[in-house]
Each structure stands twice: as structure tokens, then as C-alpha cells.
Amino acid sequence: MKNSYKWDLSVLLNNQSLQANFLKIQTVSEALIKAYNNGLCFTNKTSFEQFLAIDDKFTELENRYTNYLYNKQNENNLDKEVNDAIFAYQSFKNNHNLAFSTLQQELYNHEKLIKDYLTDPKLAVYKRNLMLVFRDKPHQLSSQTQSLLSQINPCFNQAERIFNILSTADLNLQPVVYQNKKYPINSVSDYQSLLENTNRGIRKACYEKWIEIYWTNRNSLSLSLVENYIQLENFAKLKNHPSYIAQTAFNDEIEVGFIDFVYQQVAQFAKTFQAFIRLKKQIYKHVLKVNKVEPYDLTLTLFKTKKSYTIEQAKQDALKVLDLLGDNYIKIVKKAFNENWIDWLADKNKYTGAYSISNVKGLEHFFILMNFDKTKSSLNTLVHELGHSVHSWYASQHQSQNIDPTIFYAEIASIANELLLCYYELQLYKNNHKQLIASLLSQINHFFGATTRQIMFSQFEKDTLYLIRVNQKPDFKTLIKIYANTAVKYQGFKPEVVANKLKKTQYQKSLSHIIAIPHFYAGNFYVYKYAIGQVAGILVAKKINSGDKKMKDNYFKFLSSGSSLAPLETIKLLGIDLTSPQPWQEAHNEVKRWLKIVKQSFKKLQK
């Protein structure tokens, strides 16, 4: 009998063993190498079509097999059979890739012929991906440079390896001591748990230790980050891009100026951010009955319900929340529940957090990993991840090649679902001031976390990269000064206030997390894109919630498009042009409306 709270990954193997699936991939790999024929497949249309067909088959088999392996590993990272299979697959894939080391150059060599082939309507689905390859031609390395880089490849990414050690194994995890009682700390999450303790003294003691976790290694972490940026800048210039940021903008099919435009729009949220922080502190001061609200007070969840929340309740609530999206959307959500797409429960060796799978070409099930914690926060996680999975379902139904959305707009579908939950709770809690305040405080927090905070991170990256381009090598003090100054532009703090705070060691410690953000090592300058997902997601949910049929129709066009269009063009399917100030202002106005509701509810709560 199936466990309804476990995902059923076995469907990915088509009722065959791991070994049989691996053998099938190896067989198709051999056929693909033979069809490639060292690039001769591009010399005539028939062999080109055969190569594409076998490549499609290989991709689909590989997606099924790797999704099975890596998700089984995340289910239990000590599964020896799975870990051995992953090792064998990685060895195979390295050899497979070697057989196609000349692929890009052969595509360039046969560009004119291939463009002629693509005029055939039967091959139109391959056009976007191949045109993106040709677009990148001026930025490809010469064969001599490529050969040299492959020889010295082991020297690369040392900064990231050092960072991974310094930010995990070498973390300064000190036990928290309060009133002679020691609270052992084995991971960063242990600090986070204590920061939610109802005892204020424990929270204060925890906060003082928590802000020191990167402090001991601050100089090494700073050096690691700067070396990482130096490498990224140098690689971008090797590929004929003026800078690392310009390279990533090119890859996203946008102008560099669009990133600055996003910064300008988010900077206009500063006054509202200040108003939110003031109101939030007033609420915490009232509820906690303290004279002054400290940072370690704001980590506490207000108005926590003691009721245990079940998976079955979460399922029913998710269906209610997403009902506005229509019968077909609900039908897919029910498929996710009934066909075991979701691995619900936490387990000892399981990956922490939540995600919806990617690389979905050839799949019919779009799996979700969760760690359900029996609280309503898991409902937010559930609708978020369902947003991703249903997005994958629609894209798979309408696209044969460009299915997985890019990170540029991938969060829109999940944020829209979170906002539909917010609007549902606005109605549900209209007579419950405590829960209404808690719901909206959480949502406004998310908004500023994804816009203001992430843009501060992005501005920090940009300003640091600028110093590197003018041959300066910033140290820890310079880095935290850069980061602190972003609070002037995006959070509305006065420059002199920030300058005075920077003189205090405690404040410097509280800023040291900026040198320990894994996203900065990703190599694609992407944290500003969280603001895009947040703003577009708000507008989608707001309009669908108000019964806007045009937005609903546009939304399903968006979900169905996958990655078949350039990122900004994909978002325009929603009727949203993010190169214009209007959508940014509209989202901002909606947040101001939420803030007004919180103020009104707080006044009633005080009576």
C-alpha cells in the first residue's frame, strides 16, 4: 500500500530497475555520438534531424533518471545504492560530454546551413535554442584559450571551495548561555530556533552569539568573496564582455541599464519601508510589553496559534486558496495530491527546506519536496511550491523544447500563489485582528525581503565589482561600509546615522553576514531578480483576486510559454511591462494599502 505522504519517484523509472534505466541511457548516448559523427551531422538536413531526434530522446531519459537519483538522495543522503549510482552516472556523463567537446564550434562552422534547415516549420521548435547559441558566437573563446583553460581548470573555483568550508565546517558556532544553562549549537538553524524562544533573555543571549558566526572568519571570507569576483570579472573579459554584470545581462537578453532601472524603482519603496518598520516596532512593543524593541525581539512570531495543523488541512486550504485560478488548475493540484507528487514529512537524513523539481522535459509528474512542520507556515510553502509545479505542468503541455522557466521569472507563479493565500486570509481574518495583523506583517516582510533586502545585496555586489574593475581590492571594513551605505538609498536611513553606527563593533558584527551569502558565488548575478518575481506576482494575484478575466487569461499564456521567449517578453504575456515605472508603482501602492489595513487593525486591537 502506498504511503500517501511519500512521493512516488518510481514512476520516473518506467517500472524498470535503476540498472536497466542506466543501460538505456548509455545505449542512447552511443547512438547520439554516432549520429553526431564529429559534427558531420550538420552537413545535411536528414542527418541533422536524426541528431535532434536522438538528442531529444537522450534528454528525456536523462531527466527521468537524474531526477530519480538526486531526489532519492535528497530523501535520504545516506542511501548507498543511490550514491553509488550517482557516482557512476557522473563518470559516464563526463565521458559523454567529452564526445561533444567540439559541438559548439561545429554549430558555428555550419551556422548558415543550420539556419536554412530551421526555415522548415517542422524544425521551428528548435530555433530559439540554436539562435541563442549563434548569438553567443562573438563571446566564445578561441580553441587555444579553451584548451589552456581546460588544462588549468583545477585552479578555478578555489574561492568558492574556501567559502564553503569557512561558512560551514569552520563556522564559529558558540553555545548560548543564559542563567547558567547552556544551549548547545550544532548548526545555524539551532540559533534560529532559539531566536524564536518566548524568553527574551534567551533571545538576547542567542542574538549576541548569532551575529558572531562569521565574525571570526571575516577577513578570510572577505578575501574569498573578492577573489571570486576577480575571477568572474576576468572570465567575462576573456569572453569579450565589458564586465561580469554585462555578461549576465547579455545571457538574460536584457540591457545592463534595466538592472539600474530596477534599483531606481525599489529605491522609491524606502519611505514605505521606514513606515513599516515604525509600525512593526509599535506592534511588538505593545504585544511584548517592552520599553524598546530590539533586533532579537523582531525574530519572534506574534500571535502564534497552538493548534496543530495537519497535512489534510493544508491540502483542503490550498484547494480553497487556489480556487480562483479555475477548475483546470485545481484539477492539476489534485493530481499532485493524489498521484504522490509530494514528499511531505521531515526525516533524519532528508534535505531541509522545500523545492519543486526542474529539468522536466519528458516528465509527467512534477515532484515537490517539503518538510511539513504542523504549522500554517507550511501552507505558504505548499502553495508556493505548487506554483512552480503547476507552472512546469502547463509548460510541458504546450512546449516540446523550452519548458523550464528561467530564474528571471520563475518565482512569479509561486509568489502569485502566496499572494492568493494572503488575499484569502485577508477575508478569512477580517474580524480577527491578531491573525490579520500576523498575516499581513508576514506578507509585507516577504515583500521587503524580496525587494529592498535583495536589491541592497545586488547593489552591494555591483559597487564591489566596480572597485575591482578600477583595480581596488576591498577588505572587510570596505565591504561592510559598502553594504551599510545601501541602507541610505533603500531603507531611508540618514548617512550620518549609518556612519555613526559603523563605528560600533556590535553593528559591524550584525553586518558580517553580507560576506557569507552563497548566491554571490553562483556566477550569474541574480539576486535582483527576486524583486521581479515579487512585483509581478503581486500584480497577477491582485488582479485575479479582483476577478480580472484578462489577467487570468494572460496568466495561463504565461504559464504555458515555458522559456520559449526572452525573459522580459515572457513577463509581457501577463500584460506587465517591467521596463515601465507603472507596475512597480502599482505593486508599491498595494503594499501601502496592506500597511493601512495593519494600522487600522492595530488601533482596534489596542482598544
Curated annotation (Swiss-Prot):
Signal peptide: none annotated. The keyword Secreted does not apply. It comes from Mycoplasma genitalium (strain ATCC 33530 / DSM 19775 / NCTC 10195 / G37). This is Oligoendopeptidase F homolog. The keyword Protease applies. Belongs to the peptidase M3B family. Its cofactor is Zn(2+). InterPro entries: OligopepF_N_dom (IPR013647), OligoPept_F_C (IPR042088), Pept_M3A_M3B_dom (IPR001567), Peptidase_M3B (IPR004438). Zn(2+) binds at residues 384, 388, 391. Binds 1 zinc ion.
